[in-house]
Amino acid sequence: MVTHSKFPAAGMSRPLDTSLRLKTFSSKSEYQLVVNTVRKLQESGFYWSTVTGGEANVLLSAEPAGTFLIRDSSDQRHFFTLSVKTESGTKNLRIQCEGGSFSLQSDPRSSQPVPRFDCVLKLVHHYMPPTPCAGPKQPGGALHPKRTYYIYSGGEKIPLVLSRPLSSSVSTLQHLCRKTVNGHLDSYEKMTQLPAPIKEFLDQYDAPL
């Protein structure tokens, strides 16, 4: 295992400036994956960085069920945690990083494969309900309902509902426009028709949330 301080700065993205810089990384590729993810999370507007589990509970206490945020994990074995308000209170779900991808912690008794993603934002978006302008559709334009996922906590089986992120900062107008465009680009063909500078700008944050 190697730590962030072992990696040279040359040719790499901006070093981590959150509590994650004290974490241990298994490889340079994992370090780069986390650096790229942090950069996108910092632009997302709902990354709360060093907020603790207790502080996340306070932040979400007055919010409706389905409100969520991303923060740094207090567990040294993990990088990020998804804190979400449920009907049973706030639940903290570890986001696991393994084999160059992220996944949400699952019930160890389950034999079902866990969805994996190369970015935390894509992971979060996967568990959110489909919007009218995106998502797979049935004939006639109706959206296919997404599969229901469950949280297993303290013996409870709770449906995982991610409705809206809790904002940690005000997004720029440019970023809001980028998210809107990302939500409407549902095919590679549409992306290739865009001018190169716009494609590059969208690639820097390729999520609709």
Curated annotation (Swiss-Prot):
Alphabetically, which GO biological process terms does the record hold?
Answer: cytokine-mediated signaling pathway; intracellular signal transduction; negative regulation of receptor signaling pathway via JAK-STAT; protein ubiquitination
> InterPro entries in the record, alphabetically?
SH2 (IPR000980), SH2_dom_sf (IPR036860), SOCS3_SH2 (IPR035863), SOCS3_SOCS_box (IPR028414), SOCS_box (IPR001496), SOCS_box-like_dom_sf (IPR036036)
Q: GO molecular function terms here?
A: cytokine receptor binding
Phosphoprotein listed as a keyword: yes
The record ties this protein, via Pfam families, to: SH2
For the region Extended SH2 subdomain (ESS), give the residue spans.
34-45
Q: How is it modified after translation?
A: Phosphorylated on tyrosine residues after stimulation by the cytokines, IL-2, EPO or IGF1.
Q: Where is this region: Kinase inhibitory region (KIR)?
A: 22-33
The chain positions of domain SH2 read 46-142
Question: Could you tell me which residue ranges the SOCS box domain spans?
Answer: 161-208
User: Which keywords annotate this record?
Assistant: Growth regulation, Phosphoprotein, SH2 domain, Signal transduction inhibitor, Ubl conjugation pathway
Q: List, alphabetically, the SUPFAM superfamilies matched.
A: SH2 domain, SOCS box-like
Q: In which pathway does it act?
A: Protein modification; protein ubiquitination
Swiss-Prot/TrEMBL domain comment: The ESS and SH2 domains are required for JAK phosphotyrosine binding. Further interaction with the KIR domain is necessary for signal and kinase inhibition.
**PANTHER family, per database record:** PHOSPHATIDYLINOSITOL 3-KINASE REGULATORY SUBUNIT, SUPPRESSOR OF CYTOKINE SIGNALING 3
Complexes and interactors: Interacts with multiple activated proteins of the tyrosine kinase signaling pathway including IGF1 receptor, insulin receptor and EPO receptor. Binding to JAK is mediated through the KIR and SH2 domains to a phosphorylated tyrosine residue within the JAK JH1 domain. Binds specific activated tyrosine residues of the leptin, EPO and gp130 receptors.
Function, in words:
SOCS family proteins form part of a classical negative feedback system that regulates cytokine signal transduction. SOCS3 is involved in negative regulation of cytokines that signal through the JAK/STAT pathway. Inhibits cytokine signal transduction by binding to tyrosine kinase receptors including IL6ST/gp130, LIF, erythropoietin, insulin, IL12, GCSF and leptin receptors. Binding to JAK2 inhibits its kinase activity and regulates IL6 signaling. Suppresses fetal liver erythropoiesis. Regulates onset and maintenance of allergic responses mediated by T-helper type 2 cells.
Descriptive protein name = Suppressor of cytokine signaling 3
Q: Which organism is it from?
A: Gallus gallus (Chicken)
